[in-house]
Amino acid sequence: ERLQRSGLFEGVSVTLDGDAGKADAAAVTVRLREAPLQQATVGVGISANTGPRVSLEHLHRRIFNQCATLRNKVEWGAKRKAWEGELASHALPGLYRNLLGGAWESVESDTDRVYSARVRLGRAYETQRHERLWFVQGEQVRVRPFDTSTAASAGTRTDTTSATLNFHSTWRELDSI
């Protein structure tokens, strides 16, 4: 499971030699099928709220020849434009991963355009039973109305900034099925 969660392999199989005569020194065979170094996905579609769009997602599993994965997703549509990215270290000792992420989005409605940006720095811990994610996040949202001719519509222009400290945790206790 750890090998599969790393995202570096397309397929993992582990077999144990079942010969009872070799029980003290049983052979374990691990077969791995490595995932490609880079992967790109192109999408074309229509969103119910924002209309037609195209997207491109790119994943590099060893960016700058470092033990890190870089993921970027760009979406371009008639009313929505967005970018989301994450740089994550491969598993470190103790099964931790360091994370750095960001996002930017512009969404247009009939009355205004909303811009949002986010940056996140954190650390993740993932095992079969436990998942923990700690991160600090900064976010900014700007709302810009199209009609600023009246005092009421000009007053709807807003800027909001936030900084948060976050912790997510999952614990699983499952019977073998």
Q: PLM features: what roles do these ranges have?
A:
Residues 1-177:
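Gram-negative/organellar outer-membrane beta-barrel architecture
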